[in-house]
């Protein structure tokens, strides 16, 4: 038993907001083949990952979908510092291709789309920043009251997106990065939501206290031109 304990203790863990999965998988593969370093990577909703860190989970680096969660952890003394903004995310509306929905931001069209949808998929707004952005967008468009009784919540942005991909919900909201990924684009059309229709999705990452050097190196690599190029290719702006 003592042996397996030490193995667990030495394996560094990076926790990542679910919207970053396609980009992070690509960055990690590149990093692993360049350095031979391996980590455990766990994907989830930013708020859920934050709660686990507050409860003492042995995570070393938190790559969030927003700034609020990492800055709260920093204030509470869980992190090395306030971390760095590594990406600016974009929100997208998606529709299952089999449902014959033509996505549009024109007031009348959008109202019709929301009215005719029996379910609207989004990630839980209290734990998932992209779910929060979706609520802000619908509020700004004056459609929140029409929409809110139809919300089908995913535990994180991946599961919310999947509702639309499999047709359990005709429409939903996701990260633009996931909307353009091959797995999603095959089964769902997307519409990029203009940035001025929700609060900016500034994504911040923070090192949790006493990180192993291997994780500090990876954190620095995430700010490198190579990593930034991948993040950009996945539909984010980089600071």
Can you say where each PLM-predicted feature lies in the sequence?
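Bacterial N-terminal signal peptides
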Residues: 1-6
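Exported/periplasmic ABC-transporter solute-binding proteins
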Residues: 7-34, 40-43, 47, 51-57, ...
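Short active-site segment of divalent metal-dependent hydrolases/proteases
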Residues: 63
């Amino acid at each position: 038993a003592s042996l397996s304990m030490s193995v667990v203790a030495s394996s560094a863990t990076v926790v990542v907001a679910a919207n970053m999965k396609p980009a992070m998988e690509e960055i990690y593969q590149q990093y692993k083949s360049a350095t031979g370093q391996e980590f455990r990577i766990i994907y989830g909703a930013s708020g859920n990952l934050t709660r686990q860190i507050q409860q003492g989970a042995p995570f070393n680096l938190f790559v969030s979908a927003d700034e609020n969660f990492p800055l709260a952890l920093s204030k509470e003394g869980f992190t090395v510092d306030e971390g760095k903004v590594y990406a600016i995310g974009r929100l997208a509306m998606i529709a299952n291709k089999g449902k014959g929905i033509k996505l549009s931001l024109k007031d009348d069209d959008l109202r019709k789309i929301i009215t005719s949808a029996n379910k609207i998929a989004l990630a839980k707004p209290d734990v998932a920043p992209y779910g929060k952005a979706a609520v802000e967008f619908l509020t700004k468009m004056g459609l929140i009251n029409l929409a809110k009784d139809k919300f089908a919540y995913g535990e994180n942005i991946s599961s919310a997106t999947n509702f639309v991909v499999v047709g359990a919900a005709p429409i939903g909201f996701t990260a633009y990065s996931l909307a353009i990924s091959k797995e999603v684009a095959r089964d769902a059309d997307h519409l990029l939501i203009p940035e001025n229709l929700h609060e900016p999705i500034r994504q911040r990452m923070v090192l949790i206290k006493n990180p192993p050097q291997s994780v500090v190196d990876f954190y620095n690599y995430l700010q490198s031109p190579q990593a930034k190029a991948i993040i950009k290719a996945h539909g984010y702006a980089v600071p």
